[in-house]
A protein has these predicted regions:
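N-terminal flexible/basic segments that precede or flank functional cores
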Residues: 1-15, 63-66
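Charged, low-complexity surface patches
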Residues: 14, 25, 53
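Alpha-helix N-cap/N′ positions at the starts of helices
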Residues: 16-17, 41
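Short basic helix-loop element that most often maps to the first helix and adjoining turn
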Residues: 19-34, 63
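Short alpha-helical DNA-recognition segment
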Residues: 29-47
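DNA major-groove recognition helix of helix-turn-helix/homeodomain DNA-binding modules
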Residues: 40, 54-70
């Protein structure tokens, strides 16, 4: 159960699925290293999100989407 009503698979800023993270990065034409640097996280953290070993926090996902859109 999510600890907050806006988190989880159905909230407005839901945690993205690993495949969604990878697809967004590839669509932006970024390497994992560049994507991690773009949102100020570690390369290992980004790799964990894409592998499905950790869930990406909605704030990181939103920041990534904003930065690649501009």
């Amino acid at each position: 159960m999510p600890s907050h009503p806006n988190r989880g698979p159905k909230g407005p800023t839901a945690n993205p699925a690993p495949a969604e993270v990878r697809a967004a990065r590839e669509a932006a034409g970024l390497s994992q290293t560049a994507a991690a640097a773009l949102i100020h996280c570690t390369l290992r953290g980004w790799q964990e999100w894409e592998a499905g070993n950790r869930r990406m926090h909605p704030a990181f996902w939103e920041l990534f989407r904003i930065k690649v859109a501009s």
